[in-house]
């Protein structure tokens, strides 16, 4: 597990500025942009992204779809739809884990060596950040333990408080 954890990076900043093979967009089911990171990615990528997204016919919660990066430094955008928090008894944890797994599978299938994730579902979808970060780090580390690609996974955090949650989640996994 420690080798997988060595491939994880924590970054505080703007995901739209990262020069990686793919960034992950915390999208809605329509894939047509919205608030938070979704809106920021759509604005930074340009109108061409919306045109391509319209052709994808949406995305189910827990699934992922891939587009070009257009005006972003990233070659690709992987769009995944996280669950809306409903108290934790409606399969939210499994759906959130599926977002990370599906995104990593698409990244590997498209030869992405580096992938950056936002904190999926923790904004307007109200998923508790401490739980979400544990699921994110746990799922990603399990997937990359078994696969060579992507080589590097970045958790791109909007603020230092969120970055600290990711650092603690990684440290907890290192301890076992």
From Swiss-Prot:
Coiled-coil stretches noted in the UniProt entry, renumbered to this chain: none
One term of GO molecular function: O-acetyl-ADP-ribose deacetylase activity
SUPFAM superfamilies: Macro domain-like
Domain spans labelled Macro: 1-174
Record field: transmembrane: none
Protein family membership: Belongs to the MacroD-type family.
Cross-referenced NCBIfam families: PRK00431.1-6
Name of protein: Macro domain-containing protein mll7730
Organism: Mesorhizobium japonicum (strain LMG 29417 / CECT 9101 / MAFF 303099)
Taxonomic path: Bacteria, Pseudomonadati, Pseudomonadota, Alphaproteobacteria, Hyphomicrobiales
């Amino acid at each position: 597990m420690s080798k997988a954890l060595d491939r994880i990076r924590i970054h505080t900043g703007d995901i739209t500025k990262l020069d990686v093979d793919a960034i992950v967009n915390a999208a809605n089911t329509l894939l047509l942009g919205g608030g938070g990171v979704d809106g920021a990615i759509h604005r930074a990528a340009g109108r061409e992204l919306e045109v391509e997204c319209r052709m994808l016919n949406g995305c189910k919660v827990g699934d992922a779809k891939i587009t070009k990066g257009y005006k972003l430094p990233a070659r690709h955008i992987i769009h995944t739809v996280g669950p809306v928090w409903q108290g934790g008894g409606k399969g939210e944890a499994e759906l959130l884990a599926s977002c990370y797994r599906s995104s990593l599978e698409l990244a590997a299938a498209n030869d992405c060596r580096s992938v950056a994730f936002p904190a999926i579902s923790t904004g307007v979808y109200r998923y508790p950040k401490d739980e979400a970060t544990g699921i994110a780090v746990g799922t990603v580390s399990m997937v990359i333990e078994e696969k060579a690609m992507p080589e590097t996974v970045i958790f791109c955090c909007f603020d230092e408080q969120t970055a600290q949650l990711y650092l603690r989640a990684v440290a907890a996994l290192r301890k076992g």
